[in-house]
Amino acid sequence: MPAHVTLSDGTVVTPGVMPDTIPNVGHTVADQLAAMNIQHGIPQMNGWQNITDGSCDAAAHYQCISGYKPRQVPNLTSLAQKFAISDMTFSMADSPSWGGHLYAVMGSLDGFTGDNPNRAKGVPPGRGWGCDSNRVTPWVGPGGHTQLVPSCVPDYSLGLANGGAFRPTPAAYHATIFDELHSAGLSWRIYGATAPMPQFFGGGYDWSICPSLAECLDTSQHNNLVDSSQFFTAANSGKLPAFSIVTAGGSHNAVRESCHNQYSMTACDNYIGKLVSAVEQGPDWSSSAIFITFDDFGGFYDQVPPGLNPDKTQRGPRSPLIVVSPYAKARYTDTTATTFAGILAYTEQNFGLAPLGPNDKGAYPFTDAFNYSQTPLKPVRMVHRALPASAKRIRITPAMENDPS
């Protein structure tokens, strides 16, 4: 974080320190484009005061231009100081959570802008954000025309109407890393929320990835979406699959521990520590690589202009990323630019899988962050802190229920 930030209107802002309750800053596609302020194809990274809902303007005290001190996130700090970090991992697109979860497993947005889905007019609401939601989201066709279509990656081979979407859609089928793993006989799981719950983000079901893919939701693949509590059981018993994704949510209310805006950073840091400890203390530690990251940048300031993906689409702002493994280089900062597609590329190269498309084929796979010849690093002790009073007062408000992120 620089000492001072100059915005496009000439305002100079001194970055602040965030409270434990993460500020509520807009981060829709429109917000991200406003913040990046792309001029002649080059992001200027100085339009943060123009985030569309006013959540980072002068009246909001430029709250998005702020960060956390190491003492506020002791587990993340310990992991970053012991293992490897990437300071050049960009979002694959200027999209919030729904798009971030798509490209995490496809290396593509399949024509979607990535904006979080909204209710379709005249249709009863369904479950979550995906194929069973009866929701719509913007999709850009080959000619550049944007239209609202079901928030579902269809699979027309299933024999279902509309490929599994609730109404006809121009979106095409796109393979996922799950398909590759299955074809290779490799196990995988998504640890998250298996059904909607009466909580923010459906108790995490909105983030569970599988429901947005007809091929996952409507086939036996959906059996690989299990409650997040099962991650701890698998880690403790040495039965983790070859590939795991942990999303915030599930029966133990991990949505409140998600690091999402309006929730407690202490709760999130505690939860990350609990997840990492389960692996570190389990039988699978010696063969594990953990990538800790966030599905988007949350609306918070970043000064580094993102470039383009291999398929020439625009990247979005950076997301923090920590690599935790016995074979991660100790106290190493990986400065090679990449995206979530780099995690796909790492997985594919590790297991000898073919790339899904140009973005993971051309992505940097965190090669320099690992040294498989080194003496394996030992686990780092994680801590659990009491929640501050502000975290105990957090309640679901109408504003949170209607938050498009």
What positions do the PLM features span?
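N-terminal pro-sequences and low-complexity stem/linker regions of secreted or lumenal proteins
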Residues: 1-405
